[in-house]
Amino acid sequence: MGKRIIPQRRGKASPVFKTPDHIHVAPARYPLLDPSKTYKAVVEDLVHDPGRWVPLAQVKLETGLVFYVPAVEGMYAGQIIEIGPGAKPVNGNILPVGMIPEGMQVVNIEKRPGDGGKFVRASGTYAVIVGRAGGKTQVQLPSGRVIEVPNESRAMIGVIAGGGRLEKPLLKAGAAYYKWSAKSRVWPKVRGVAMNAAFHPHGGGSHQHVGRPSTVARNTPPGRKVGHIAARRTGRRKG
């Protein structure tokens, strides 16, 4: 009798597949503030969040409110930052994209005013303000794609910290194990053709091959629904 394949185990949501959110620090987003006022705040600390690749900055407003945002390069504990339309466009300050000069590097950009930040939050990334038209600001994302967001959407000046993360080699499998363990992802990722027949529909045989068409129907039952699911076509394009 066959065993449950990994997608079936993931659907059951055992602890291996659950995010350990009890060790996460806090959501990283801008607080809801009066958009007409400019606030001063202090960076109290830079903290590590096991659920992220990016360090978080613990920021305390002059009103006493504490929140967390992804830290930018050059940010330090004790730094005074400004938040609002009257803030200067310098590293670490948060202000509406409509107030940021063209050509500046920005991160953690709001898709809609007040959502806390949706774009450009990964380590070492930044976007560039490229232009404005009709109440919207054009921003070039790290992928090269240009998007438009309302002028009232907020962003932070700078480059997300942790950009050298991928430069350090893991060197051994144990390091990769602990790396992905903190993110609650299954590692290592084993190919189906490398498994025994009892553990995957593509497993078994004297050499690694699928042994049957890898395309399956949309309504295929769990345990068999692997490979190219409801594929219109597979293989190399011809002509």
UniProtKB/Swiss-Prot annotation:
Gene Ontology molecular functions: rRNA binding; structural constituent of ribosome
Region (Disordered): 202-239
UniProtKB keywords: Ribonucleoprotein, Ribosomal protein, RNA-binding, rRNA-binding
A biological process term (GO) from this entry: cytoplasmic translation
Keyword rRNA-binding: yes
Biased composition (Basic residues): 225-239
GO cellular component, one term: cytosolic large ribosomal subunit
Keyword Coiled coil belongs to the record: no
Pfam families cross-referenced by the UniProt entry: Ribosomal_L2, Ribosomal_L2_C
Alphabetical list of Gene3D superfamilies matching this protein: 2.30.30.30, Nucleic acid-binding proteins, Ribosomal protein L2, domain 3
Family matches, as HAMAP family: Ribosomal_uL2_A
Family according to the record: Belongs to the universal ribosomal protein uL2 family.
Subunit structure: Part of the 50S ribosomal subunit. Forms a bridge to the 30S subunit in the 70S ribosome.
Reported function: One of the primary rRNA binding proteins. Required for association of the 30S and 50S subunits to form the 70S ribosome, for tRNA binding and peptide bond formation. It has been suggested to have peptidyltransferase activity; this is somewhat controversial. Makes several contacts with the 16S rRNA in the 70S ribosome.
Protein name (Swiss-Prot/TrEMBL): Large ribosomal subunit protein uL2
Gene designation: rpl2
